[in-house]
């Protein structure tokens, strides 16, 4: 017998104690092997959930840099329309758009959002004027999801002559930017998502005025997993990338 019962507990017999000493090292080796296995799997696949627009305009063009730095981490991209709630059990990291407060999640700010009036170079050179903000009244306004952003922009800049209740509405930011790039009107473009189009010369900002919002892009994960190797590595890479690019943009504007 290995055990003897005393009241509601079990005690090792002499034979049980001897057996335990014999197998103790085996269990220690098993635990060590399990830890190594978990460590290897931790450095394996990394699933990221994020909005399609952010994936297309920001992450995918930069992913080669991460793959070069971390060749042992296989990134899996999961594009979803919804932000909150997309950090499911099969997802390690998510990109959320909002104000940064989600219970049980660690959220690190990537980019503060501001919106910029943007149009194609051809539209700027067209027959309709585009020299001052009030000239927006001569152009089609392109809307992202709703008309609230243009309404707020017009209110803050005293544009009583601009009709913000007309113009097509698109369900994705990338669609608005593409419409603007094809000369269909003027968009209020997100500073992060529009940057590739601006850099490529497909969109230009005819005015200096911007609309600051209370929203930002955040890289989020479950608090209990925040220090896991692959998650921390990817988060740190994103934050470093975002901060360095914001410095580059500020320096570029300063030199203009």
Language-model features: where?
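Acidic, Gly/Pro-rich loop/turn segments at junctions of secondary structure
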Residues: 76-169
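A short LG(V/I)-centered, amphipathic sequence patch enriched
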Residues: 1-12, 203
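Ligand-binding "clamshell"
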Residues: 102-109, 197-207
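Hydrophobic hinge/microswitch elements
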Residues: 162-205, 212, 243
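Alpha-helical "hinge/linker" immediately C-terminal to small N-terminal DNA-binding modules
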Residues: 11-39
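Central regulatory/effector-binding core of bacterial HTH transcription factors
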Residues: 43-103, 251-256
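C-terminal effector-binding regulatory domain of bacterial HTH transcription factors
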Residues: 68, 72, 191-200, 210-256
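Hydrophobic residues within well-ordered alpha-helices
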Residues: 13-16, 86, 136, 178-183, ...
């Amino acid at each position: 017998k290995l055990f003897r019962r005393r009241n509601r507990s079990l005690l090792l017999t002499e034979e049980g104690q001897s057996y335990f000493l014999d197998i103790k090292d085996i269990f220690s080796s098993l635990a060590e092997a399990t830890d190594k296995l978990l460590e290897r799997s931790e450095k394996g696949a990394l699933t990221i959930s994020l909005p399609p627009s952010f994936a297309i305009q920001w992450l995918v063009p930069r992913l080669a840099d991460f793959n070069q730095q971390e060749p042992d981490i296989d990134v899996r991209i999961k594009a979803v329309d919804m932000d909150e709630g997309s950090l499911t059990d099969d997802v390690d990291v998510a990109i959320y758009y909002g104000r940064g407060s989600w219970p049980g999640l660690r959220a690190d700010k990537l980019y503060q959002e501001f919106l910029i009036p943007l149009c194609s170079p051809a539209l700027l050179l067209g027959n309709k004027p585009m020299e001052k903000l009030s000239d927006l009244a001569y152009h089609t306004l392109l809307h992202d999801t709703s008309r609230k952003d243009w309404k707020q922009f017009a209110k803050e800049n005293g544009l009583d002559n601009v009709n913000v209740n007309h113009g097509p509405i698109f369900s994705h930011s990338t669609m608005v930017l593409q419409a603007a790039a094809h000369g269909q009107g003027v968009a209020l473009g997100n500073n992060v998502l529009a940057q590739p189009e601006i850099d490529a010369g497909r969109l230009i900002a005819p005015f200096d005025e911007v609309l600051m919002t209370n929203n930002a892009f955040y890289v989020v994960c479950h608090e209990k997993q925040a220090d896991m190797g692959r998650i921390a590595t990817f988060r740190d890479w994103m934050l470093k990338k975002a901060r360095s690019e914001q410095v580059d943009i500020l320096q570029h504007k300063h030199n203009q």
